[in-house]
């Protein structure tokens, strides 16, 4: 029993460690991208109600293949539109503004920006089971613009 609990604890800990580092501060992300010569990846999500958003998080964002690529190439920004949890007013205002600015019509939406905030490409939706390799390939195609 102890070994089973230890194994489960290791699995949960390793999944948490694989989670890429995301910020919610758009302006700080642009500044960081400029300083580090990276792109910005915006994830427009409904974290507590959007099933495909949850699958994208579980099947892609927690996987080593995505994390390794993202850490080298992007500053990651979560732009969340939850229904159950309350966001601080300034974050809600920022997210609403970004949703309007980028004309978000569905969730999840991934948008790649250069460090000046110019859109290089977007993916709307997530194909369950496609995994990190498909998402990374799509993101790489935006980097060539």
Kindly give the residue locations of the regions a language model identified.
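Thiol-based oxidoreductase modules, predominantly thioredoxin-like and allied folds used
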Residues: 22-23, 63-93
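Sec-dependent N-terminal signal peptides
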Residues: 4-14
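A short beta-strand-turn-helix
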Residues: 22-40, 70
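Non-catalytic, surface beta->alpha helical segment in thiol-disulfide oxidoreductase systems
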Residues: 59, 97, 101, 105-145
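Sec/Tat signal peptide C-region and signal peptidase I cleavage site
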Residues: 15-20
């Amino acid at each position: 029993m102890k070994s089973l609990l230890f194994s489960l604890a290791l699995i949960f800990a390793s999944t948490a460690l694989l989670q890429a580092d995301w910020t919610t501060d758009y302006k700080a992300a642009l500044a960081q991208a400029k300083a580090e010569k990276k792109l910005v990846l915006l994830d427009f999500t409904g974290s507590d109600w959007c099933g495909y958003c949850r699958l994208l998080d579980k099947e892609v964002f927690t996987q080593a293949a995505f994390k390794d690529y993202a850490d080298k190439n992007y500053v990651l920004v979560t732009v969340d539109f939850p229904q159950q949890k309350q966001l601080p007013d300034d974050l809600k205002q920022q997210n609403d503004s970004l949703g309007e600015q980028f004309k978000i019509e569905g969730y999840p939406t991934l948008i790649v920006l250069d460090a000046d905030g110019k859109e290089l490409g977007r993916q709307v939706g997530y194909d369950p089971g496609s995994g990190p390799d498909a998402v990374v390939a799509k993101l790489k195609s935006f980097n060539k613009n």
